[in-house]
Amino acid sequence: MNPLVYFSSQSENTHRFISRVGLPALRIPIATEQPALKVDRPYILVVPSYGGGSTKGAVPRQVIIFLNDPHNRAYLRGVIAAGNTNFGAAYCIAGDIIAQKCQVPYLYRFELLGTAEDVANVRKGVTEFWQQQTT
């Protein structure tokens, strides 16, 4: 199965969610001085939303750098976003921004660490998404 590619800050919220999903995953490095992640096959991006309710700064800088690499962007097939409902209309806005700019489907959104239901939905949805891509 093709991987999930994700970014998680030092809070590790997205990392913990990805660990619970249990599917193959690659992590975008936190520190920009670490070696850049280069993908070699289609993937779904899992991204947290930042900015405290504003669209400015909603997409983490590391994700912007990753997607600004045309090689990495070419393999993007969908996006899943994490967020905080306290952000109101900007809840999971990073997913909206990336889906629109990269012209890929926005597959799912979840709050903070996600619930057991979110984990099951993402696991099932990602599996079905890749099966549909190969038929």
UniProtKB/Swiss-Prot annotation:
GO terms for molecular function: FMN binding. It comes from the Bacteria. GO terms for biological process: protein modification process. It holds the Pfam family Flavodoxin_NdrI. Signal peptide: none annotated. Belongs to the NrdI family. HAMAP family: NrdI. Probably involved in ribonucleotide reductase function. This is Protein NrdI. The gene is nrdI.
